[in-house]
Structure formats: C-alpha cells, structure tokens
C-alpha cells in the first residue's frame, strides 16, 4: 500500500499542478466539437492601465467557477483571454510610468513606447491569472491592438458604414481638455463641486436693466441669446426684443423656451455655445449662431480688451468676475454646490466643442436595445435595471472618435482631388488592417488624400470582444466565417457592474447593428471587492491589497474560497476571517482524505473502478444508504445552483455538507465499522468503506471548480492519474436512491447531538463511556443502534415509544 503524504505544501503543489495542466493541455478548446456541445465565454480583457489588485482575482475566479463546472459537465470550453491594451487608459499609464506626454513627442515614437509597456504589463497579468488557476486556453489569447484585432475592429467600422449606422458630422461633442480628446456619454461622471451663482446685469436694447444668473461668466463672449419661460409673467413683455451683453456689447435675441426653470436664478438664462446640453438644444431648436471661444487645450481664444485671451477656464472666470465687479455689473454672488460633468479618467470638467467626429447611431435604437436587454438572461436578475436605466438616459449618439495616438485608426482618408475635395474614402476590406497615416486608398497617391488622424474609442474595439475571438463581424465581413458562425453568439459574458453602461451596452449595440442578435445568451455580473471596513479600495487610502502577498500567505485555493463566498453581483469586503476559514477547509480536506485513504486497500479493484450506481447493492448498511441519499441530494442541489450561476450557494451547500454531514457525523459514526479490527461485521465494514470511497470522491469533484489544486492533489492520490478537471468528470446520480426511512438515521443524529452536548456540559471526552442510554420517542433498527452504541461509547441502549418527541436519559 502506498503512503499518504505527511502534509500539504500549497506553494509547491499549486506550482506543480499549474505546470502540469498547461503541459497536458487540460483546458484546450477542440474546434472539431459541435456548436451544441460547446460553451463559449466572452472573457473580460483586462485594461492594461495600472497595478494588479485583488479585485482582478475576485471577479475572474468567479467566472472560472462556472467555466470549470461547465467543462466537468461535458462541455467543450472556449475560454480565451484578451488584453485591452489600446486607447486612452493605456496612454495614461505610459505617460505616468515614463513621465512623458504624447503631444510633446513624435507620434510613432510614443506608440513604440506604448507597445513596450503593454508587453511588460501583460506578462504580469498572465503570471497572476496562472497563479489563481484560471482555466483559460492561452492559445486563444488576443490583444485589442494586435493586427488581427485592428482588422476586425476596422471591419466593424466598415460594416456599420455600409449599413448606414455610422456617420461623420461637425457637431457639439464632450471634450476632455486634459487628455485632449472627445469623449462619449458613457465616459463621463457627475461630480459635486462648489461654485458661485453670479448675478450679472444685462440691458435691453432700450437700456432697461436685466439680471441673469450664471455659474460660467467666462462664457459671456459666446452668448448668443437670452431665454425666459413663455409662462413667466415677469418677462413676457420682452418678446421680440434684444439684450446687450455686458463688457462685449453684443446684441442677442430675447427668446421664450419651456426648458427655462422659472425658479432658478432670476428666470433669465443666457445661452452660450456651449456651456451645457441645454445650450446645444437651444442652439439647434432656435437656429442660433455658433461662437466658439474655448480651445481644445481648455483655454480662451477670444481677442478682446478684457484680456482673457489665452487664459485657462478657471483663470478666465476669475478675470471676468473681477472686471464685472470693477464696472459694477456683478450684482451679487451666491455659494452653491452643483453637479459638473467630468471625464471619468482624468477627472477634468468637460467642455463642449464643435469638432468633426464619427458617431454610431444610438438614440434611434433605444427601444430595440431595451428589448434586447429583456431577451438576455441576467445573473443576478436585478442587474438588468441598470442597463435599462442607462438606455433610457442616453441623449447623445455614440462618439467614437478620439484625438489620441495608441488606438485603432479609422480606415478613412479625405480626397484632395480637384472636383471631389473632402470626399470620404474608405479602405477596401482586403487592405485591412490599415493605418491611413502610412497606407493609401486604392487608386490614390499620397498627394491626393488627407488621412483621418484620429483613432477609435477603445470601447469601439472592446465592444466587439466576442468577434475578436470568433474572427468575424457579419456575413459580409469575416476573417474566418466558419469559426465565427460556430462560436457566435456566445454563451456567457462575465463582467463587473460598473461597466454595464459601457462594455455591456456597447457590445449589445454592436451585435444588434451587425447581425440583429444578442452577443451572448447569459450575462453574469460581479460586484466590487471592498476593503475590510467596506470602503472602496484606493491608493490614497493605502488599503489596496496586492494579490502576490495574499497568494504567498494563503495560496490560490484559499483566495478562490474567499471569492466563492461572495454572493453573485454583491460588493464584498476582503475578510481575513474568511481566508482563515478557507485555510482550515484545505487542512480538513487533507486530513479527511488521509483518514479514508487508510481503508481503501480493503476494497476490490473492480469496486474502485465502478460507479456508485454500479455498486449500489454492495452498500448494505442503513446509515450508509442514508449518507448516499444525502450525497445524491447535495449533488442535485449544487448542480442546479451552478447551472443558474449561483456559485456561492453551491459552495455553501458543499462546504456545510462536508463539515457537518460528512466530517462531524458520518466519519465518526462509521469509524468503528470502517476499522472493524476484530472482523465482527465484514459486510458493514465493506459497506462503510465503499461509502467513504465514493462520498470523498464526489465531494472532491464538487469542490474542484472552487479549489482546483487541493482537489487535484487528493484526487490523484486517492483515485486516478487522470485530472479531476477534465471534460465530463462531473457526477450524475439522478437515478440513484435507496428506499429507506430517513427518520431512523436522522433520529440517530438527534440522539448523538444530545449526547455530545451532555458530555460537553460535563467536561467529558467525547469518547467517555456511558453505561446506559435510555431513549424514548424512537426505536432504531439493529444496524443504527449498533452505530449509535459505537459513536457514543455506550454499553447498552434501551428504546421505548412513549411519544414522537425524542428524549434521552444518560447514565454514566
């Protein structure tokens, strides 16, 4: 008989199994298996934008629980890993790391530095993802900046151009003056900021004073109208008249519009091009002129004696206020707190500029997208409302132009040929991927075209993350149409809740526009990982947890255990207590396996190879049969929970069964029969060892999606040299059931619980002998009574039926 190892070294074993799994290609996708038998995951490509943190471990392992389960259920798994390594987030990382600014250096040199940085950062991700045992097929890896990804992203653009779902227009857009780029509505966040409401004197053309209130007096040079509410009796007499702006003496119309709030300020509002979205609405509705005074760098460009030209926005605001005070045109100021739209990444307050940009039609599809949201299977269901709320709130088409460098270029040029100046020239699909700064459209020379210098929003590429893996966009645009048709739509999109409005929304939009379908059948939403005090982790607070230290301290299985204890979609605080519980569970699994291992040499070889269903008749003891029935019930419950993406429920059920039903009760109750050193009950002994053998094997399989290393190690020691994680290794006991009266076994457990409490109260050892157990309320079978005698160390047990309530009298 081989020896059971003395102890479990997680550091050595985890590295060992990670290497073996890779070498044996345990997680390899088989492209020859039918679509119906394949389970396809749209893995979140992590943004290459900074330090790895415990949140990466938290969310990615939760996906892996489901993937491992589906593989064990017999599915051919397509589980890729990508890296979202283009766009503004990566540029900001590079600028910070290298202490450089993209705009201060050659474009090609900056791109080269970006490529070097992302290669280094991605290797860190690969290392971490292997350490936490993500069962991805690394041969399916992609980068959003790779030539193939650029080709597919540009295919997406051309397909939407062909479908007339993309357009180029010169219209107001949200502009980040810090990062120097246009942004989409989803790239902004509302921030509460303190400011002043400034009450300023205008005049009518007749010289009558008018008071308007504004938070942005620096936009006075861009004022094109003054508005009042049509029902506001204070100002109805102004209809058809004009106002004169202070300092700049520009004549602007006085107009009525229902968007004016009568209760805000004075009820008179100046319309500037542009201070906010209402200004845009008024500008369009009333056909007002355009006055642009803000540059792309966030400075004022307006030649005037007020000397605000060249000043930054805040500086210009202060300067204008000072001048208004000097000329007694500022009546008063009120301290206010108001909501300001800011760039999500730079944090800068946004401006609205008029710049030619590419847009994807979005507003016209809102109703269709709401229907798509309802067609999708949401896990958990309550997350659907977040997407619905976002769709309902959309007020802009999706601006996909970015004035940056490290991104996917638009496959576009503009003609300079005589007679067709400005004509948009699109690349032919056979040319993709192209860089219009280096390549040329078919039939044109360099002198005849102007390239589009912008790059696409990074979401424009990551929104086709499924297609980056399937290698196709639509029937007309595909690198490998057979592969695309086999993998798309996918089965699962796992992601965090804060990017529902971006990644989920944009991917649904693209799939809808490209192929009139959903991109996946299911979406699984994870929450945030919080600090132990339930605050959000941040570098400024110093509470960011680094995965490497935790892996060194606890190992991957314990960290995965912590992640599995978090309910799907819920924000969860890091917990040392949960980590310690996970470590305790690993140790208990090891010790329980060590106990059952010593009995396995007593089993016949054919019974070890047979399934539990095949050797059903050899399990003869009543308590063993009850144990198997409880195991079958557990398998059904855990399987159902995992099929519904409720990994935490499955983990909880399995762990509770292991600790309470198996370790605390079954191992103790069957121990005497399992040893049976005097050979008093060979049939009962064989029954118990068979039960131990199959229950332990099943429990290892139920724990395997969550704790892959310890379960693999024990499975190899106890059962097989084949991996526990291979396709089709899950258990199915749907046809297994013993026809027994469960009340007997449950009565035994109730009596045992009473005896244990009695001995604990008396400070007696659990093995302390008992002369007599007097039990009323139940009569156990001879087999169960014998097990009860053994586990309680009772010399004699007497039963009588007085009533249905179990009572126990203990005589020492």
Curated annotation (Swiss-Prot):
Location of this chain's protein in the cell: Cytoplasm
EC annotation from Swiss-Prot or TrEMBL: 6.1.1.9
Species of provenance: Rickettsia peacockii (strain Rustic)
Catalytic activity: tRNA(Val) + L-valine + ATP = L-valyl-tRNA(Val) + AMP + diphosphate
InterPro entries: aa-tRNA-synth_I_CS, aa-tRNA-synth_Ia, Anticodon_Ia_Val, M/V/L/I-tRNA-synth_anticd-bd, Rossmann-like_a/b/a_fold, tRNAsynth_Ia_anticodon-bd, Val/Leu/Ile-tRNA-synth_edit, Valine-tRNA_ligase_type_2
Function of the protein: Catalyzes the attachment of valine to tRNA(Val). As ValRS can inadvertently accommodate and process structurally similar amino acids such as threonine, to avoid such errors, it has a 'posttransfer' editing activity that hydrolyzes mischarged Thr-tRNA(Val) in a tRNA-dependent manner.
One of the Pfam families matching this protein, by short name: Anticodon_1
One GO term of the biological process aspect: valyl-tRNA aminoacylation
Subunit note: Monomer.
Record GO terms (molecular function): aminoacyl-tRNA deacylase activity; ATP binding; valine-tRNA ligase activity
Protein name: Valine--tRNA ligase
Record text about domains: ValRS has two distinct active sites: one for aminoacylation and one for editing. The misactivated threonine is translocated from the active site to the editing site.
Binding sites annotated in the UniProt record for ATP: 539
Family statement drawn from the similarity comment of this UniProt entry: Belongs to the class-I aminoacyl-tRNA synthetase family. ValS type 2 subfamily.
Cellular component GO terms held in the UniProt record: cytosol
Superkingdom of the source species: Bacteria
Keyword set, alphabetical order: Aminoacyl-tRNA synthetase, ATP-binding, Cytoplasm, Ligase, Nucleotide-binding, Protein biosynthesis
Positions occupied by motif 'KMSKS' region: 536-540
Main location per the UniProt record: cytoplasm
Chain positions of motif 'HIGH' region: 46-56
Main EC class the enzyme belongs to: ligase
């Amino acid at each position: 008989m081989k020896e059971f190892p003395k102890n479990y070294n997680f550091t050595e074993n985890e590295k060992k199994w990670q290497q073996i799994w890779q070498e044996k290609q345990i997680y390899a996708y088989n492209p020859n298996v039918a679509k119906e038998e394949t389970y396809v995951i749209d893995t979140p490509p992590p943004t290459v934008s900074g330090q790895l943190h415990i949140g990466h471990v938290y969310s990615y392992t939760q996906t892996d629980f489901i993937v491992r389960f589906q593989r064990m259920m017999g599915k051919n798994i397509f589980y890729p890993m990508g890296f979202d390594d283009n766009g503004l987030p990566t540029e900001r990382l590079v600028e910070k790391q290298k202490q450089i600014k993209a705009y201060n250096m050659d474009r090609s040199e900056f791109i080269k530095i970006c490529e070097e940085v992302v290669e280094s950062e991605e290797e860190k991700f690969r290392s971490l993802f292997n350490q936490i045992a993500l069962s991805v097929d690394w041969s399916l890896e992609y980068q959003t900046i790779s030539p193939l990804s650029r080709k597919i992203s540009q295919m997406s653009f051309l397909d939407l151009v062909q479908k007339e779902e993309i357009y180029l227009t010169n219209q107001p857009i949200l502009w980040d003056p810090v990062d120097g780029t246009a942004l989409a509505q989803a790239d902004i966040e509302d921030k509460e900021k303190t400011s002043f409401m400034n009450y300023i004197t205008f005049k009518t053309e007749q010289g009558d004073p008018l008071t308007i209130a504004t938070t942005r007096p620096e936009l006075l040079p861009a004022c094109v109208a003054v508005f009042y509410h049509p029902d506001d009796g204070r100002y109805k007499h102004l209809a058809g008249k004009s106002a004169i702006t202070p300092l700049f003496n520009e004549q602007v119309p006085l107009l009525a519009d229902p968007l004016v709030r009568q209760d805000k300020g004075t009820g008179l509002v100046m319309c500037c091009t542009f201070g906010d979205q209402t200004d845009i609405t008024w500008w369009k509705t009333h056909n007002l002129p355009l006055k642009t005074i803000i540059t792309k760098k966030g400075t004022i460009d307006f030649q005037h004696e007020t000397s605000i030209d060249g000043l930054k926005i805040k500086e210009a605001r202060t300067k204008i206020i000072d001048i208004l005070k000097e000329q007694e045109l500022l009546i008063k100021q009120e301290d206010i707190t108001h909501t300001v739209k800011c760039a999500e990444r730079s944090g800068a307050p946004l401006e609205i500029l008029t710049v030619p940009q590419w847009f994807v039609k979005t507003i016209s599809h809102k109703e269709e997208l709401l229907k798509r949201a309802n067609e999708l299977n949401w896990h958990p269901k309550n997350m659907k409302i977040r997407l619905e709320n976002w769709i309902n709130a959309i007020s802009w088409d999706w601006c996909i132009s970015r004035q940056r460098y490290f991104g996917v270029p638009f496959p576009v040029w503009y003609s300079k040929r005589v007679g067709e100046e400005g004509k948009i020239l699109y690349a032919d699909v056979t040319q993709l991927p192209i860089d219009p700064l280096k390549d040329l459209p078919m039939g044109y020379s360099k002198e005849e075209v102007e390239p589009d210098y912008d790059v696409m929003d990074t979401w424009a590429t990551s929104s086709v993350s499924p297609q980056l893996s399937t290698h196709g966009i639509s029937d007309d645009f595909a690198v490998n149409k057979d592969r695309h048709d086999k993998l798309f739509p996918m089965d699962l999109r796992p992601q965090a809740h804060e990017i529902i409005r971006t990644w989920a929304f944009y991917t649904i939009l693209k799939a809808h526009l490209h192929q009139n379908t959903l991109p996946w059948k299911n979406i699984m939403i994870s929450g945030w990982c919080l600090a132990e005090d339930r605050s959000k982790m941040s570098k400024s607070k110093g509470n960011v947890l680094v995965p490497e230290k935790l892996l060194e301290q606890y190992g991957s299985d314990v960290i995965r255990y912590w992640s599995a204890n978090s309910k799907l979609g819920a924000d969860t605080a890091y917990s040392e207590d949960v980590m310690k519980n996970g470590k305790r569970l690993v140790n208990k699994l090891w010790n329980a396996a060590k106990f059952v291992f010593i009995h396995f040499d007593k089993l016949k070889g054919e019974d070890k190879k047979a399934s539990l269903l095949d050797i059903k008749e050899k399990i003869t003891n009543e308590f063993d049969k009850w144990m198997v029935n409880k195991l079958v019930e557990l398998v059904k419950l855990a399987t159902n929970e995992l099929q519904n993406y409720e990994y935490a429920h499955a983990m909880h059920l399995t762990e509770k069964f292991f600790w309470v039903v198996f370790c605390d009760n079954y191992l103790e109750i069957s121990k005497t029969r399992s040893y049976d050193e005097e050979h008093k009950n060979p049939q009962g002994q064989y029954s118990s060892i068979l039960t131990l053998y199959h229950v332990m094997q099943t429990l290892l399989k139920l724990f395997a999606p969550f704790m892959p290393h310890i379960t693999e190690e024990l499975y190899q020691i106890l059962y097989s040299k084949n991996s526990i994680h291979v396709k089709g290794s899950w258990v199915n006991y749907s046809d297994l059931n013993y026809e027994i009266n469960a009340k007997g076994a449950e009565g035994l457990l109730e009596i045992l619980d009473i005896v244990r409490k009695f001995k604990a109260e008396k400070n007696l050892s659990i093995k302390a002998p008992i002369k007599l157990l007097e039990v009323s309320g139940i009569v156990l079978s001879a087999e169960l009574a014998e097990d009860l005698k053994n586990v309680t160390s009772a010399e004699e047990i007497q039963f009588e039926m007085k009533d249905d309530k179990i009572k126990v009298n203990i005589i020492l």
